[in-house]
């Protein structure tokens, strides 16, 4: 990375993931996953449902894993096969859930951000996006990156919150919307 960024924001949502690098209090760069939703919240949700778990209960299971399965950073098709094989071999739900949490983070760090070493991330990391409500994903990030991450209480709505702050800042009393009403449509 050359210069260590003052702060980085890792955002993993239901369908995408991004890394926003802040330098001199300004967004310096944004990296976004290109196509696959592997490692995003919907991916974990699908697995949880396939095993008859809520996302919350599935995430809690991961915290009791003894041997998380290694799914690497592959696409969902390959991960599905790997999970099915692990199930046949007797892997517990906890080990599957933890393996998925690790794969989410590995995918974000090594495929999206394209780090060669997790320590290149720096130390001032804010995580956001609904996927980070999953404590297993947060803990996996902290273990792999070797840092303590800051997770706001409103991690899942940080983007909307930021947009609302900008709208409030730019609002003027005499502003008239150009948005069509239902009757005009």
Predicted features, each with a name:
Residues 103, 116-142, 155-159:
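Glycine-rich phosphate-binding loops at beta-strand->alpha-helix junctions
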Residues 54-85, 175-184:
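Internal, active-site/partner-interface "lid" segment
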Residues 24-67, 156-159, 165-169:
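Glycine-rich phosphate-binding loop plus the immediately following alpha-helix
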Residues 1-5:
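Short, small-residue-biased leader/transition segments that mark boundaries at the very start
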Residues 18, 166-185:
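Acidic, glycine/GT-rich loop-and beta-edge segments that sit at the periphery of enzyme/chaperone cores
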Residues 6-23:
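Gly/Thr-rich phosphate-binding beta-strand-loop-beta motif of the actin/hexokinase/Hsp70
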């Amino acid at each position: 990375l050359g210069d260590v960024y003052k702060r980085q924001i890792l955002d993993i949502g239901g369908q995408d993931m991004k890394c926003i690098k802040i330098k001199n209090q300004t967004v310096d760069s944004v990296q976004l996953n290109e196509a696959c939703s592997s490692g995003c919240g919907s991916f974990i949700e699908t697995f949880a449902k396939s095993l008859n778990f809520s996302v919350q209960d599935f995430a809690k299971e991961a915290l009791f894993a003894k041997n998380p399965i290694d799914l690497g950073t592959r696409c969902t098709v390959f991960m599905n096969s790997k999970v099915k094989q692990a199930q046949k071999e007797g892997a517990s739900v906890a080990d599957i859930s933890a393996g998925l949490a690790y794969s989410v983070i590995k995918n974000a760090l090594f495929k999206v951000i394209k780090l060669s070493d997790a320590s290149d991330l720096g130390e001032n990391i804010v995580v956001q996006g609904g996927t980070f409500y999953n404590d297993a994903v947060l803990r996996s990030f902290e273990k792999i990156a070797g840092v303590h991450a800051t997770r706001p209480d409103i991690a899942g709505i940080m983007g909307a919150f930021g947009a609302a702050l900008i709208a409030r800042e730019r609002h003027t009393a005499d502003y008239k919307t150009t948005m069509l009403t239902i009757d005009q449509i």
